[in-house]
């Protein structure tokens, strides 16, 4: 793919890909190739910022979600039901899942990518509650799974323990599967308590996720950003939503 094509950059940058994008359109902690886009909230975290976080005794974990082309796919349908999410690859270490479980109520996700990954873990744990020997394909979180009442009865602690037990039974040190989760108004967050995120474009699933998290207060937040000349999108300003 590297030989046949070029790094895809957001279409709203209105320019061709440049060689420098291979370094600048990337987080400093990226390790695994696979995403079609950088998780742009992470672009704010320089080595110096990460060192300062560590010095404050703030724990951090790394996880993998290969961002799909659907990230740039605008919501064109009249209702959310008409929008189809793409499948995205997920990989999370067992040690990370255990640490998340031990720190529930304190989890801050860097970027909507991390939010989708972390919230998907809950529903994978729900699947394992009824199907302890589920295959990787059976663990894939379907788009509308979170909105079915029967899929929301476990605590986050119980769901994550199901994953840990599953990994132990399979003598695996990481969970590898995928998700098609859509997070939109009405969604109940199970794991994430805060989000570090940029300001997103209209008619995007990313803005739907933010609206779900701040329970409809996104208009006030975005109005403030516009009035104070905040920069939007990939190379824009960041925010901490709690």
Q: What is each stretch, according to the model?
A:
Residues 1-242:
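Surface-exposed, charge/polar-rich loops and edge strands
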